[in-house]
Structure formats: structure tokens, C-alpha cells
Regions:
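Flexible, glycine/charged-enriched surface loops at secondary-structure junctions
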Residues: 77, 120-123, 212-219
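Active-site mouth loops of central-metabolism enzymes
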Residues: 131-146, 189-195, 238
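N-terminal small/glycine-rich loop or linker at the start of catalytic domains
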Residues: 40, 91, 115-140, 174-184, ...
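Structured beta-strand/loop patches that form or line metal/cofactor-binding pockets in enzymes
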Residues: 1-40, 44-45, 49-50
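Catalytic core of soluble alpha/beta enzymes
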Residues: 164, 169-282
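Conserved, mostly hydrophobic/aromatic
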Residues: 3, 41, 65, 104, ...
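Metal- or metallocofactor-binding catalytic centers and their adjacent structured scaffolds
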Residues: 37-115
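Catalytic domains of carbohydrate-active enzymes, especially glycoside hydrolases
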Residues: 153-162
Length: 282
């Protein structure tokens, strides 16, 4: 079996208005489907992260990566991935290049599953557990009252874990008062603070028993600063959404920069690299 073509399909999915209203609603969510076609008629489907620059990712996939892998055996996933990494070394180690590689790599696993007539999780060694809890990831709201209302809405739908996107103590207090002590709350702040500001905020938030505090420091790769935050608070620190490489995650672990690793499978190179990062956490 040989790869005959790589196709990148940009999507723009309209976002519905939400109640309560949020500055994050409206517009479209951009994403890219990646199709790996073969000479035997089997096609693999993957997904590439594309927030903010979808056409740039499409260009990397179709103009840079496709010429490298057309003609290769799609079932030799490690080989194809190695060719992509080496062929994009100068510009593809992070960001858009890694997003593009991720989409193709995920499509290769989908293709392998179709050839073997097995779900990908079985190809990876089987399920460790039959179910996982899901959390509701809330939008960012303009008032504590809106936060409380959104929390009550999702708890009524059955969620027992909620992730907030606020950057103030009052909103977290309102959320905790709205849901009571038995619902887990996480807080994703999207990298707003210096390490010193983050330490002060983390300590101020401790009474509300956050399950984790996510990405509290700018820039997100300031792992030394994040390590200071992690050492100064009882709240677990989550990070890694903006990291693109196994080696970056190794540095997070080495510096003890946080407690919860959050690799995005469409950002770090796909399923194979994701598994290696999970092994680091173990």
C-alpha cells in the first residue's frame, strides 16, 4: 500500500449564541480535516489544529508535507512521521508545522484501523478503563452572576466537573457558592500573569478548592516561573496546552513546572507523541 495524496479540508463551523452571553460566542470555529489517500482505495481521516491560521496549516500540509510522504507505506507510521519531522526541521518543530504533522499522523492511525478492522484504541494496546468522566468547559463571562448561572445550568445537565475561564477571585467564589462543595471546579486563566502575580492569585483562590489552576503564567513556556508557582500553592497546576514537543514536556517534568500535563493531540505531533508524553507523566 502506498500514499497517493494528502488532502487538507478547512472548516469554518458557526458558533451559536449562548445564554448567558459571553464575549467568546459568535463567529466561527476553524478546524482542518486531513485525508490520507492510498492506491488501494483506503482513506484515513485526521484533524489538525488551525485556530487563527487555517490556510497556513493547509499550505504546510499540501505544499510541504505531502511531497515528503506521497509514495510511502502509510502503515509504517513511525517511518512516515520521522520523514515529516526531518523534512520540516528548520520551520516545523513547533506551532503550525507540528499542527500539520499531527493531522497527517492521526489520519495514518485511522487508516491503519480501517485496514486492520479494529478501533485505534485496540491498536494502541486496549482500553485501560471503560469510561472517563467528562467536564463542562465554560466560556468566559463578564460578571460573577453570569458565571454562577452558567455553573448551575451545567450541573443541572448532570456535569460534576466544571472548568471556568475567569481571571478574578469573585467569579470563582460565585461558582463555588452556586454549585456547593461536591462539584469539582477547574480554572483555566489562559496565561495572564507574571509568576509573582500567579502565586498571589493561587493563594487567594485556595479557599475555593480548585481541582487545578491552568496556565496561570505568561509566557506559557516560562517553566521556571511555573515551577515557582507550583511550589508556592496547594492547588495543582495544569499546563502544556501551548507546548508542541515531547522535549518541551520533558522539560516541564524535569523542572517540576506543574502537576497536570495537558498535551493537545492535534498540536504535539499526533497519537504517537501523545502516548510518549503520557509516559513522561507516569
Amino acid at each position: 500500500m502506498k500514499i497517493t495524496a494528502i488532502e487538507a479540508v478547512p472548516l469554518a463551523i458557526p458558533l451559536k449564541p449562548m445564554t448567558p452571553p459571553s464575549p467568546w460566542t459568535g463567529g466561527t470555529r476553524k478546524q482542518i480535516y486531513v485525508l490520507v489517500h492510498t492506491d488501494e482505495g483506503v482513506t484515513g481521516l485526521g484533524e489538525a489544529f488551525a485556530y487563527g491560521a487555517p490556510l497556513a496549516v493547509v499550505s504546510v500540509i499540501e505544499e510541504s508535507l505531502a511531497p515528503l510522504v506521497v509514495g510511502l507505506d502509510p502503515l509504517a507510521i513511525e517511518k512516515v512521521v520521522d520523514v515529516m519531522h526531518r523534512g520540516t526541521m528548520i520551520y516545523g518543530r513547533r506551532g503550525l508545522g507540528m499542527f500539520a504533522i499531527s493531522g497527517i499522523e492521526i489520519a495514518l492511525w485511522d487508516l491503519l484501523g480501517k485496514v486492520r478492522n479494529a478501533p485505534v484504541y485496540e491498536l494502541l494496546g486496549g482500553a485501560l478503563r471503560p469510561r472517563l468522566p467528562a467536564y463542562a468547559s465554560l466560556l468566559r463571562y463578564e460578571t460573577p452572576e453570569a458565571v454562577a448561572g452558567a455553573c448551575r445550568h451545567f450541573v443541572a445537565q448532570g456535569f460534576r466537573m466544571l472548568k471556568l475561564h475567569q481571571t478574578d477571585v469573585a467569579s470563582v467564589r460565585a461558582a463555588r457558592e452556586a454549585v456547593g462543595p461536591d462539584v469539582e471546579l477547574m480554572l483555566d486563566t489562559n496565561c495572564p500573569w507574571t509568576p509573582y502575580e500567579a502565586i498571589a492569585m493561587a493563594r487567594a483562590l485556595e479557599p475555593y478548592r480548585l481541582f487545578w489552576l491552568e496556565e496561570p503564567v505568561w509566557p506559557p513556556e516560562d517553566y521556571a516561573g511555573l515551577a515557582r508557582v507550583a511550589a508556592a500553592t496547594e492547588t495543582p497546576i495544569a499546563l502544556g496546552e501551548n507546548e508542541s514537543t515531547l522535549y518541551g514536556f520533558n522539560e516541564i517534568v524535569r523542572q517540576r513546572a506543574g502537576d497536570v500535563l495537558q498535551p493537545s493531540i492535534t498540536k504535539v505531533g499526533g497519537i504517537s507523541e501523545f502516548k510518549k508524553i503520557a509516559a513522561l507523566a507516569q
